[in-house]
Amino acid sequence: MNPEQFTESLQQALQQAQQIAQTRRHQEIGVPHLFKFLTQPGELVRQIFSEAGADLDQLQTELDRELDDIAVVSGGNVQYGGSMSSSLATLMQAADAKRKALGDDYLATDTLALALMDQTGDQLTKYLNQQGITAGQVKNAVDRIRGGQRVTSRNQEDQYQALEKYGVDLVKQARQGNQDPVIGRDEEILDVIRILSRKTKNNPVLIGEPGVGKTAIVEGLAQRIVRGDVPENLKDKTLFSLDMGSLIAGAKYRGEFEERLKAVLKEIKKSDGQIIMFIDEIHNIVGAGKTEGSMDAGNLLKPMLARGELHLIGATTLDEYRQYMEKDKALERRFQKVLVAEPSVEDTISILRGLKERFEIHHGVRIHDNALVAAAKLSDRYITDRYLPDKALDLVDEASAEIRVEMNSNPTELDQVNRQLMRLEVEEAALKKETDDASVKRLADVQKELASAKEKQRTLSERWDSEKKSLQALSDKKSALDKAKHDLENAENNYDLEQAAKLQHGTIPKLEQELKAMEANDHHEDWLVEESVTPDQIANVVSRMTGIPVAKLVAGEREKLLHLADHLHERVVGQDAAVDAVSDAVLRSRAGLQDPNRPLGSFMFLGPTGVGKTELAKALAENLFDADDHMVRIDMSEYMEKESVSRLVGAAPGYVGYEEGGQLTEAVRRNPYSIVLFDEIEKAHPDVFNILLQVLDDGRLTDGQGRTVDFKNTILIMTSNLGSELLLAGVDDQGHLSADTHQQVMQLVQSRFKPEFLNRIDDIIMFTPLQLGAIEEIVVKLIDRLSARLQDREITLKISDEAKKWIAKQGYEPAYGARPLRRFITNHVETPLAKEIIAGRVAPKSTVAINLMDDHLVFENQSTQPA
């Protein structure tokens, strides 16, 4: 008996049997050790005994009992599992003799099962015979699984029933009702049927973007085969979906994958055209299993495809078809393309309506029709990097799951009562320990409140339980109706007219009537739990997925938006025109009035340095997102050279940094609802403006990897110092800009930027130099910020009007704007104050007054001692 003639599975089984012997400290490997492993899930021998009629759980128990009866050996020099027992050696010799009789080249595990049944003296054989398992039954099971094949390779066990092992019968799935209905793809299904009916090149390949429904078309074909709604040449055909993952998984040795695929193809060939094979992600077969000197899977398929022995349906995406299939012209030639386009919003709504019942039954919720319409429309508008109907189905599924989770959690009212109960019980326990009159009186009040809260809790709990039971009953009734409809379909397909009539005129109308009555009796408006999916829930899911505020405005948000201009004015002083223009753009967008194909707003801020251009962008970000760093800031001084322009959208293929993506496109792809600030735009290379043209006009930009990035939910702000000298000189005492200056600045802008760029910007806003009154307000804001930093030390700052005016006058330089103020306050307020704190003259919990004396600032400590 040569171990080289053992199959891989048998060699592995012997190794595992040795491990079992070592774990149990048995000196020899016996029959129970080997069969303990061979009857594990996934093993061939387990399948053989199962088909022969053995109770596998009881068989495992019997093997454990036999293993427990073997004596445990202990000692220093004992080699556990080092040799075979005489019974196992006899079994192996008998199995080898049977191998020769069967004409097998290798000894396989199924031959071992056949040989075991001939060992009448073995304990395991006796047990199987007692259970009614005979040698004939085991042989029949082996013959069924082998399908007339001999063992000619070391991996033969992997090749038995290859289609069942590596594929899924889609027609069987459809017959059992395990597939979702396919709606609105009749044209593509008919194309597939036409191609399958051809004499040559009868292999369709479905090509389309991910999520458009390629696999659904194949499932639709399977459902048509079940209904008999196909030409005669396709009736009674079987449609198998090949799982390339499980076919490749575990193929350790060269040639093992090819052997498995050959076994699948052999079964298909034997079926004499009755099996149609479907390979999803068919591009994987190009190059699969290819190593140096070997063929890939695609080359194994070519001869059968050419001779018409294999009917194959493939599915792949446009990019992968181009990348893999088109390179192999011989393989591509054998397929006929069927292009699967993304369905329209209207078609998607029809698909969602068709699947509505399936979602309702699965989640146990009610889905409103307007929620389906919202899912199709909102996903089409806001989720731009995916395709319909997949993204719309995701929204409905996610919203339904959210409602289901809420239904299984305590309602808010009940939760509040439970918390109140806990608080009162803690208070009652504490008061019981007190004896004074006030505590006794309070205890009586607490006990009354406790009794009332317990009654309320009981009422709410009963109401909630009743609602849950009602929902479950409704869900069960829907499931029963769905099953009855599926049974009717099967009865009609099988021409069981009596059963069909019984279902159509008896069971189904009765269930529909009961369901209608249940829905009419439930008054959902006063329920504790929300059990229906509405457009609001869909909008919330979109907001969570994209970060774009799609949901209806709640009262607090309305108030916030109506006062957006006021909040911006508080932070940005002296620039009313700019603040109003930006806040109006935001209001238009949130009211849904802006052009859906352009950014929310695009502005160019012109003005001298330090007048609030960048500050306004930060203030807007803070008001919209509650954080002023929630914006994409691009410093255009970094894009002065032609070579650096590509960094915005990402390097072209073949260049360093191609995989990283662009600094602008990646930032907006991750945060589609954001403010994009192009700081110092005039410093950028002219090529940058060419990139921005399509962003400003169509709200989209294609990055270096060919992906389209959506800018329709961004506010674009460009700042520039162009015409600063003119703006500084052309302002009157009240801070108003003269018409001549305005015209001169616009001429300067037009000479610097191309007309097609300027024409696409919503508004060009000129920031005027700050007046003294505005500077005084800024001083107060800067002192307030300093005061906020001192709050940790519990130190309060106060500033007198004289000090404020003096700082404004001394620290402001019109040419430099408000920025020198910060430096002035750092030198004249922060530094002296820091010295006072370090010296211990300003203690915590004290108030420091900043006053003006003899043309310099003085700090007066108004100490407040702790109470």
Swiss-Prot record:
<feature type="domain" description="Clp R">
    <location>
        <begin position="3"/>
        <end position="148"/>
    </location>
</feature>
<dbReference type="InterPro" id="IPR003959">
    <property type="entry name" value="ATPase_AAA_core"/>
</dbReference>
<keyword id="KW-0143">Chaperone</keyword>
<dbReference type="InterPro" id="IPR004176">
    <property type="entry name" value="Clp_R_dom"/>
</dbReference>
<feature type="region of interest" description="Linker">
    <location>
        <begin position="343"/>
        <end position="547"/>
    </location>
</feature>
<dbReference type="GO" id="GO:0005737">
    <property type="term" value="C:cytoplasm"/>
</dbReference>
<feature type="region of interest" description="Repeat 1">
    <location>
        <begin position="6"/>
        <end position="70"/>
    </location>
</feature>
<feature type="region of interest" description="Repeat 2">
    <location>
        <begin position="84"/>
        <end position="148"/>
    </location>
</feature>
<dbReference type="InterPro" id="IPR041546">
    <property type="entry name" value="ClpA/ClpB_AAA_lid"/>
</dbReference>
<keyword id="KW-0547">Nucleotide-binding</keyword>
<dbReference type="GO" id="GO:0016887">
    <property type="term" value="F:ATP hydrolysis activity"/>
</dbReference>
<dbReference type="Pfam" id="PF02861">
    <property type="entry name" value="Clp_N"/>
</dbReference>
<keyword id="KW-0175">Coiled coil</keyword>
<dbReference type="Pfam" id="PF17871">
    <property type="entry name" value="AAA_lid_9"/>
</dbReference>
<dbReference type="GO" id="GO:0042026">
    <property type="term" value="P:protein refolding"/>
</dbReference>
<dbReference type="InterPro" id="IPR027417">
    <property type="entry name" value="P-loop_NTPase"/>
</dbReference>
<dbReference type="InterPro" id="IPR018368">
    <property type="entry name" value="ClpA/B_CS1"/>
</dbReference>
<feature type="coiled-coil region">
    <location>
        <begin position="393"/>
        <end position="526"/>
    </location>
</feature>
<dbReference type="Pfam" id="PF10431">
    <property type="entry name" value="ClpB_D2-small"/>
</dbReference>
<protein>
    <recommendedName>
        <fullName>Chaperone protein ClpB</fullName>
    </recommendedName>
</protein>
<feature type="binding site">
    <location>
        <begin position="208"/>
        <end position="215"/>
    </location>
    <ligand>
        <name>ATP 1</name>
    </ligand>
</feature>
<dbReference type="InterPro" id="IPR050130">
    <property type="entry name" value="ClpA_ClpB"/>
</dbReference>
<dbReference type="InterPro" id="IPR003593">
    <property type="entry name" value="AAA+_ATPase"/>
</dbReference>
<comment type="subunit">
    <text>Homohexamer. The oligomerization is ATP-dependent.</text>
</comment>
<dbReference type="Pfam" id="PF07724">
    <property type="entry name" value="AAA_2"/>
</dbReference>
<dbReference type="InterPro" id="IPR028299">
    <property type="entry name" value="ClpA/B_CS2"/>
</dbReference>
<dbReference type="GO" id="GO:0005524">
    <property type="term" value="F:ATP binding"/>
</dbReference>
<dbReference type="GO" id="GO:0034605">
    <property type="term" value="P:cellular response to heat"/>
</dbReference>
<keyword id="KW-0677">Repeat</keyword>
<dbReference type="Pfam" id="PF00004">
    <property type="entry name" value="AAA"/>
</dbReference>
<comment type="similarity">
    <text>Belongs to the ClpA/ClpB family.</text>
</comment>
<feature type="region of interest" description="C-terminal">
    <location>
        <begin position="770"/>
        <end position="867"/>
    </location>
</feature>
<keyword id="KW-0963">Cytoplasm</keyword>
<keyword id="KW-0067">ATP-binding</keyword>
<feature type="binding site">
    <location>
        <begin position="607"/>
        <end position="614"/>
    </location>
    <ligand>
        <name>ATP 2</name>
    </ligand>
</feature>
<feature type="region of interest" description="NBD2">
    <location>
        <begin position="557"/>
        <end position="769"/>
    </location>
</feature>
<dbReference type="InterPro" id="IPR036628">
    <property type="entry name" value="Clp_N_dom_sf"/>
</dbReference>
<keyword id="KW-0346">Stress response</keyword>
<dbReference type="InterPro" id="IPR001270">
    <property type="entry name" value="ClpA/B"/>
</dbReference>
<dbReference type="InterPro" id="IPR017730">
    <property type="entry name" value="Chaperonin_ClpB"/>
</dbReference>
<comment type="function">
    <text>Part of a stress-induced multi-chaperone system, it is involved in the recovery of the cell from heat-induced damage, in cooperation with DnaK, DnaJ and GrpE. Acts before DnaK, in the processing of protein aggregates. Protein binding stimulates the ATPase activity; ATP hydrolysis unfolds the denatured protein aggregates, which probably helps expose new hydrophobic binding sites on the surface of ClpB-bound aggregates, contributing to the solubilization and refolding of denatured protein aggregates by DnaK.</text>
</comment>
<dbReference type="InterPro" id="IPR019489">
    <property type="entry name" value="Clp_ATPase_C"/>
</dbReference>
